[in-house]
C-alpha cells in the first residue's frame, strides 16, 4: 500500500505513472491549491516517474532541516527565502510518500548535518507530522543528533476555515515558520 503526497501536479503525474507500472493499491493525496499553479512540464511527462519512499531535497542548507510535503512545501520554501536574509540556511526535504517513508534515511542524513529539525504539515496536530516525527526521531534514532528540541508546525486544532484567508490563519504560514526557526536558532 502506498500513500502519495505530491507537492504539485507534475509530481502527481510522476506518481501516477509509477503506480501504473505497479500492481499495488495506493492513496493519492493531491493538494487542491496545486491545480491553480502554473508549472513547467517535463518533456517526458508520460514517462516521468517518481520513486516511492525516497524523499527529495528541494533546497540544500546547513543550519536546519525542514521536512514537509504537499501544499505546505511551498510555504516552507517562502519561509526559507525569508530566513536567508538573516543568514539562516534551511535544507528543505519533500517526503513525497508517507508509505513507504524514507527507506534510505535521507532525512536522518540531513539531520546529522544540521542538528536541528522541524516537521511541517497542514494536517491536525498528531497527524502526519507526528508520524514523520516518530519515524525519524524514534525509529531511525534521530534524537542522537539534535542540538535543540525538534518541533512540529501543524494546522490549528479546530474546524478548517474556508478560502485562502482562512487557510492563512488555520494552517501553517511562512511567518509562523520563520518565527519558530529563528527561535530554534537562538537555543
Regions found by a protein language model. Give the residues of each.
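Conserved thiamine diphosphate
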Residues: 1-22, 89, 160, 180-185
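Short, high-confidence coil segments that cap the C-terminus of an alpha-helix
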Residues: 23-24, 114
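A generic secondary-structure signal marking the coil-to-beta-strand transition
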Residues: 24-25, 149
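Thiamine diphosphate
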Residues: 32-187
